[in-house]
């Protein structure tokens, strides 16, 4: 199957998925959490699979995953919610990465090769490798879901990408899940406000540590965002 046919096939699959989501009202479940909780409790393993599937589809369609992480915290609680969201987020980012690889670099460069995000990511990987991946996962320089596709077009290997994505996603997932679960169960209390402040402080410290790591490794994130990419490297 050539690149153009792959692209048309992928568009057809996306269209069918969107139609099925609309027809079965799957995303409506996210705005009706009591119904979603009941459905999952009655469905057992299928309910967990449904949540993971929704997460993957949302990520492929570039919808914000934080909404689903919050829903997971409310529906599943802090521990199971964190585990399921981590599994779902890891599978989702891997699917986006592999889809970009499958569609092919030459085809996708026609559509995204000129974008500042892709140019910055490819130049950063070429210069700094894994360090750049770690930093862009921790520091919100680019939209997270777009990164998944962009990294699929670079020379980075699949398994390091997947492992690092999972590890760097975990802190945010834990915070969102725990806070959502506590808010759903107890409402806005003094304890919740204190936890919210501590969570914000923890994320701020994490970002600052990532910036210190960037300086230690001599990773110039600002320069990589400004510079255009004129000679992309081929897969090797």
Curated annotation (Swiss-Prot):
<feature type="transmembrane region" description="Helical">
    <location>
        <begin position="72"/>
        <end position="92"/>
    </location>
</feature>
<dbReference type="InterPro" id="IPR053240">
    <property type="entry name" value="VTT_domain"/>
</dbReference>
<dbReference type="Pfam" id="PF09335">
    <property type="entry name" value="VTT_dom"/>
</dbReference>
<feature type="transmembrane region" description="Helical">
    <location>
        <begin position="156"/>
        <end position="176"/>
    </location>
</feature>
<keyword id="KW-0472">Membrane</keyword>
<keyword id="KW-1003">Cell membrane</keyword>
<feature type="transmembrane region" description="Helical">
    <location>
        <begin position="50"/>
        <end position="70"/>
    </location>
</feature>
<comment type="similarity">
    <text>Belongs to the TVP38/TMEM64 family.</text>
</comment>
<protein>
    <recommendedName>
        <fullName>TVP38/TMEM64 family membrane protein YdjX</fullName>
    </recommendedName>
</protein>
<feature type="transmembrane region" description="Helical">
    <location>
        <begin position="192"/>
        <end position="212"/>
    </location>
</feature>
<dbReference type="GO" id="GO:0005886">
    <property type="term" value="C:plasma membrane"/>
</dbReference>
<keyword id="KW-0812">Transmembrane</keyword>
<feature type="transmembrane region" description="Helical">
    <location>
        <begin position="7"/>
        <end position="27"/>
    </location>
</feature>
<keyword id="KW-1133">Transmembrane helix</keyword>
<dbReference type="InterPro" id="IPR032816">
    <property type="entry name" value="VTT_dom"/>
</dbReference>
<feature type="region of interest" description="VTT domain">
    <location>
        <begin position="73"/>
        <end position="183"/>
    </location>
</feature>
């Amino acid at each position: 199957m050539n690149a153009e046919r792959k692209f048309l096939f992928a568009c057809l699959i996306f269209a069918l998925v969107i139609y099925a989501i609309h027809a079965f009202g799957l995303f409506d479940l996210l705005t009706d959490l009591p119904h979603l909780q009941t459905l999952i409790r009655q469905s057992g393993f299928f309910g967990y699979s449904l949540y993971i599937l929704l997460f993957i589809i949302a990520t492929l369609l570039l919808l914000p995953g934080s909404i689903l992480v919050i829903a997971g915290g409310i529906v599943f609680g802090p521990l199971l919610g964190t585990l399921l969201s981590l599994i779902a987020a890891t599978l989702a980012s891997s699917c986006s990465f592999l889809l970009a690889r499958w569609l092919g670099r030459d085809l996708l460069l026609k559509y995204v090769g000129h974008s500042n995000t892709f140019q910055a990511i490819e130049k950063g990987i070429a210069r700094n490798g894994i360090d750049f991946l770690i930093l862009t996962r921790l520091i919100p320089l680019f939209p997270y879901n777009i990164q998944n596709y962009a990294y699929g077009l670079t020379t980075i290997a699949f398994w390091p990408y997947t492992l690092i994505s999972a590890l760097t996603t975990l802190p945010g997932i834990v915070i969102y899940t725990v806070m959502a679960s506590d808010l759903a169960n107890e409402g806005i209390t003094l304890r919740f406000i204190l936890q919210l402040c501590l969570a914000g402080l923890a994320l701020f410290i994490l970002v600052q540590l990532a910036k210190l790591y960037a300086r230690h490794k001599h990773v110039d994130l600002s320069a990589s965002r400004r510079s255009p990419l004129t000679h992309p490297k081929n897969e090797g």
